[in-house]
């Protein structure tokens, strides 16, 4: 239903008024192609719509980044309470493995005084992040950096560091559903036990 409503530019929260509507031939062809790509090719819905949601926040995504699905977003909704006593005291923050930039953006929204460094190894991912940062009008507060973890951050310190790094072990990567095979493996797998990048942090 979501794919249909999104593709036809219909409101996602009001299905009933359109239940008796008839599709035009071009609309039927468009939807048939969409359903084929989703059901036969097993493309993630987020790649078909070029959008993913974390709570009420929409982000652009494509196959250059993994589909955002981090529980950290829920923690940021609460400004990381109880671990952060004074959100206004956070003046600098780092998002390692930023991907689409969604967590960096949510961090900037949660901590209004913070300047963000958003780091990723992938230039492709950073291109997607740049689009999202611009969409949220945060280019003056979120700096995008191509770096392998802390390599290009020597000497820099941060009040807060967040990260949703690759953490899937090799056995689990091999057993993932077909949808995950369309996502960048660099952002999912992290060695035999899934902890290669975590050890770096």
Regions inferred by a protein language model and the residue ranges of each:
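A secondary-structure boundary/capping signal
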Residues: 19, 62-63, 164
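N-terminal accessory segments
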Residues: 1-46
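Short, solvent-exposed loop/helix junctions and linker helices
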Residues: 24-28, 66-69, 191-195
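S-adenosylmethionine
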Residues: 113-115, 119-201
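SAM-dependent Rossmann-like transferase core, predominantly class I methyltransferases
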Residues: 29-112, 116, 121-128
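Active-site/binding-pocket entry motifs
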Residues: 9, 65-66, 167
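Active-site catalytic microenvironments for nucleophilic, acid-base chemistry
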Residues: 6, 110, 135
